[in-house]
Amino acid sequence: DLARNLGLVDIDDEYDEDSDKEKPIFNV
């Protein structure tokens, strides 16, 4: 996960690289 690697956003560990494409990355 690019965003997770950069530490820009907090996402669940369940979200894999493929999952990020399908599910929203930003949790507001």
UniProtKB/Swiss-Prot annotation:
GO molecular function (one): DNA binding
GO biological process: chromosome condensation
Reported induction: Expressed in the early phase of the viral replicative cycle.
Keywords: DNA condensation, DNA-binding, Early protein, Host cytoplasm
Compartments, record wording: Host cytoplasm
Cellular component GO terms held in the UniProt record: host cell cytoplasm
KW DNA-binding (keyword) present: yes
Biological role stated in the UniProt entry: Plays an essential role in viral DNA replication. Binds to ssDNA with high affinity and localizes to cytoplasmic factories where nascent viral genomes accumulate. May disrupt loops, hairpins and other secondary structures present on ssDNA to reduce and eliminate pausing of viral DNA polymerase at specific sites during elongation.
Comment field (misc): This protein is synthesized in the early as well as at the intermediate time of infection.
Assembly behavior: Homoomultimer (Potential). Interacts with the small subunit of ribonucleotide reductase. Interacts with host FAM111A; this interaction protomtes OPG079 degradation through autophagy.
Family: Belongs to the orthopoxvirus OPG079 family.
Listed name of the protein: Truncated protein OPG079
